[in-house]
Curated annotation (Swiss-Prot):
Gene, per the UniProt record: pdxH
Cofactor(s) of this protein: FMN
Protein name per UniProt: Pyridoxine/pyridoxamine 5'-phosphate oxidase
Function description: Catalyzes the oxidation of either pyridoxine 5'-phosphate (PNP) or pyridoxamine 5'-phosphate (PMP) into pyridoxal 5'-phosphate (PLP).
Keyword flag Oxidoreductase: yes
UniProt cross-references to NCBIfam families, sorted A to Z: pdxH, PRK05679.1
GO biological process, one term: pyridoxine biosynthetic process
PANTHER family on file: PYRIDOXINE-5'-PHOSPHATE OXIDASE (PTHR10851:SF0), PYRIDOXINE-5-PHOSPHATE OXIDASE (PTHR10851)
Family listed: Belongs to the pyridoxamine 5'-phosphate oxidase family.
Cofactor note (record): Binds 1 FMN per subunit.
Keywords recorded for this protein, A-Z: Flavoprotein, FMN, Oxidoreductase, Pyridoxine biosynthesis
InterPro entries membership: Pyridox_Oxase (IPR000659), Pyridox_Oxase_CS (IPR019740), Pyridox_Oxase_N (IPR011576), Pyridoxamine_oxidase_dimer_C (IPR019576), Split_barrel_FMN-bd (IPR012349)
Length: 219
């Protein structure tokens, strides 16, 4: 049965750019001959300069009991080895990755008509990497990580704030808050990286990098 907003939703449409329309160059395989990382970092920088909120936000998809689950997280590192993010290892995503250490992430920069999709095996990072990042987090974020038993049910927001107050008091005299034993980073090692650029008439540009192979894909 059609909902009251179906007609409105079906009519939503954004027209993408083109060389002729706005001078934006077409994504080309030549841009990727030195690997995926240079263009990826450039697109992150472009998104930041364009005022995109949280240009390092990515949609992380994991598998739970054979069923996909997705959520938004923040990328906190990118190099030739892969993409790094941090979380509670006892969270739902941590449980998923313990059972199936493979994931995909998508960086959607809607304002620019671009996205990058990356997928590959996942492993926990070296504990020192987690320590280094943890030491740079704001104190409030550190307290929040200690307070939250991530993904577990709780009776109310008041109860959650009570937990935050408890850890705030516990660490009140501590200049440095220690890294929780169940908190740290994951590394996604790129097996496949796909760059997508929206183009006029939905004839989009898609280029996939798999190892040393660079392929243009039909939209």
């Amino acid at each position: 049965m059609a909902g009251p907003d179906d007609q409105h939703l079906s009519g939503m449409r954004v027209e993408y750019g083109s060389v002729e329309k706005d001078g934006s160059p077409d994504l080309d395989t030549d841009w990727l001959y030195d690997g995926w990382l240079t263009l990826f970092c450039k697109w992150i920088d472009d998104a930041e300069r364009a005022g995109v909120a949280e240009p390092n936000a990515m949609v992380l998809a994991t598998v739970a009991n054979g069923r996909p689950v997705s959520r938004s997280v923040l990328c906190k590192g990118a190099d030739e080895a892969g993409i790094i993010f941090f979380t509670n290892y006892d969270s739902d995503k941590g449980d998923d990755l313990a059972a199936t250490p493979y994931a995909s992430v998508t960086f959607p920069w809607y304002q620019l008509g671009r996205q990058v999709h990356i997928r590959g095996p996942v492993s926990t990072v070296d504990p020192q990497v987690s320590e280094d990042y943890w030491s740079k987090r704001p104190r409030g974020s550190q307290l929040g990580a200690w307070a939250s038993h991530q993904s577990r049910p709780i009776a109310s927001r008041t109860a959650l704030l009570d937990q935050l107050l408890e850890v705030t008091v516990r660490f009140a005299d501590s200049e440095l808050i220690p890294l929780p034993p169940n908190w740290g980073g994951y590394l996604i090692v790129p097996e496949v990286v796909e760059f997508w650029q929206g183009r006029e008439n939905r004839v989009h540009n898609r280029i996939r990098v798999t190892g040393g192979c660079i392929e243009r894909l039909q939209p």
